[in-house]
Design a protein with these regions (language model features):
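Helix-to-loop junction immediately C-terminal to a conserved catalytic motif
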Residues: 50
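Hydrophobic anchor residue at the start of the ABC signature
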Residues: 141
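Conserved ABC ATPase "signature" region
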Residues: 97, 108-124
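The feature captures the beta-strand-to-loop junction immediately N-terminal to the Walker
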Residues: 35-37
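Catalytic Walker B motif of ABC-type/P-loop ATPase nucleotide-binding domains
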Residues: 152-156
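Conserved ABC transporter NBD signature motif
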Residues: 58-73
């Protein structure tokens, strides 16, 4: 089943063309790898898929609804694109609970299970400011998956992780794929793209 349709997508900033005639049909239960040089437009494309920016022309449809026409944002999406907006003096659990309160349909148990899936302890009383970069990345993954979204859009999901963390996140993504999620990843780690992707796109 098609989850995402990208139809002749263009994005220009001033005279610079960032995205040029991007087309793709992305199905549920698959992982799609996007790769290319720095500045090629991967992050811009992901921001467009999440409804964070409006394309210059073309369409993005999520479950048949056109972004910026039928709706502004995808209904069920987990995202890692930029530095997450975590509160420095909240614990990991407190951060996710605060973010979950916006949607009001994620239980404390779901939050705890998401934190445990990424190898963290929901009872850890350390505040976010004291997390290492790797722990911050793990918490960002926990945030992305805690709602069990239909769509995961992940820019550099294994960034800052050690070997154990990389393997853990790869396994989580495969589990999310099995659950039926549509997963978009962009990575400079060639192994991420090669090992995880059902289909690859050069941007």
């Amino acid at each position: 089943m098609k989850t995402v349709e990208i139809i002749h997508l263009y994005k220009r900033i001033g005279k610079r063309e960032i995205l040029s005639d991007i087309c793709a049909e992305l199905e549920s239960g698959k992982i799609y790898g996007f790769f290319g040089r720095n500045g090629s437009g991967k992050t811009m494309l992901f921001r467009a898929v999440c409804g964070l920016i409006k394309p210059t022309s073309g369409e993005i449809r999520i479950h048949g609804q056109t972004l910026h026409k039928d709706r502004s944002f995808p209904e069920s999406v987990g995202v890692i694109i930029e530095s997450p907006g975590f509160w420095e003096y909240y614990t990991g659990f407190q951060n996710l609970k605060q973010l979950a309160s916006i949607k009001r349909k994620i239980s404390d148990q779901q939050i705890k299970e998401s934190i445990q899936r990424v190898g963290l302890d929901p009872e850890d009383d350390r505040v976010y400011k004291k997390y290492s970069l790797g722990l911050k990345q793990r918490l960002a993954i926990a945030q992305a998956i805690m709602e069990e979204p239909d769509l995961l859009v992940l820019d550099e999901p294994t960034n800052s992780l050690d070997e154990e963390g990389v393997e853990l996140v790869r396994n989580i993504l495969l589990e999310e794929k099995k659950r039926g999620a549509t997963i978009l990843i962009a990575s400079h780690n060639k192994e991420d793209i090669e090992l995880l992707s059902d289909e690859k796109f050069r941007i």
